[in-house]
């Protein structure tokens, strides 16, 4: 999984002397004469009323020659940078979707690794863009998910509920027979494509990954 990959890569970075600050948010970008010079981390140990608790820890300024923003979709620092330097000028607005998925442990020998199926239509209405995916993984894991555009007009639509409806389809239900759901997750997706890519660099900073909108919308892959 991508989580396992990043943990593995993180250990290699630390062995090379790179500091990784887990649990710290980036509260704002630091500037010097319109050049990005780093990030200020967020304060920690603040209660819901904004008061300092006994474990209060003030944020610190981290300076860098180059600040790389890889916050995923709609990151707070990325939005600030895009707005400050008008990086979307002349570009199409970004288009968003959400993917929800479940991992199912199936009986031994029942899943062929590399199996791929895609669906369209049910359970989504005619006015909702999207479809489902089913992947056969190693160790008899079945990956079942549903992706739908976030431009739907009905405020009562619940993507997770739509995934549950998908599992009522006779064919999908037959695939999951005797299986057990072991994990689930969700992720927002930038689907605008090439013409929705912002300008990627400013003096001292750059955008990468979903912050830049690099996902391949046709394959729903960004790595």
Residue ranges of predicted features:
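Active-site-adjacent segment of FAD-dependent monooxygenases/related oxidoreductases
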Residues: 1
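Predominantly flavin-linked oxidoreductase catalytic cores and closely associated redox partners
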Residues: 7-8, 12-174, 213
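FAD/FMN-dependent oxidoreductases across multiple families
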Residues: 128, 154-222
């Amino acid at each position: 999984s991508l989580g396992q990959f990043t943990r593995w890569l993180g250990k290699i970075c630390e062995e090379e002397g790179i500091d990784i600050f887990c649990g710290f948010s980036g509260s704002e970008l630091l500037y010097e004469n319109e050049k990005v010079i780093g990030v200020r981390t967020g304060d920690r140990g603040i209660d819901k009323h904004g008061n300092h608790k006994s474990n209060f820890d003030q944020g610190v300024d981290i300076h860098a020659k180059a600040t790389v923003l890889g916050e995923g979709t709609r990151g707070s620092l990325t939005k600030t940078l895009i707005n400050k330097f008008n990086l979307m000028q002349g570009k199409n607005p970004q288009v968003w979707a959400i993917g929800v998925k479940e991992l199912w442990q199936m009986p031994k020998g029942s899943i062929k690794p590399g199996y791929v199926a895609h669906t369209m239509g049910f359970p989504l209405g005619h006015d909702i863009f999207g479809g489902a995916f089913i992947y056969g993984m190693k160790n008899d894991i079945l990956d079942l998910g549903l992706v739908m555009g976030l431009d739907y007009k009905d405020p009562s639509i619940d993507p997770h509920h739509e995934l549950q409806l998908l599992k009522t389809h006779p064919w999908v239900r037959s695939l999951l027979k005797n299986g057990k759901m072991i994990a689930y997750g969700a992720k927002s997706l930038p689907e605008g494509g090439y013409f929705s890519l912002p300008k990627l660099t400013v003096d001292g900073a750059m955008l990468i990954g979903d912050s830049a909108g690099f996902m391949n919308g046709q394959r729903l892959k960004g790595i």
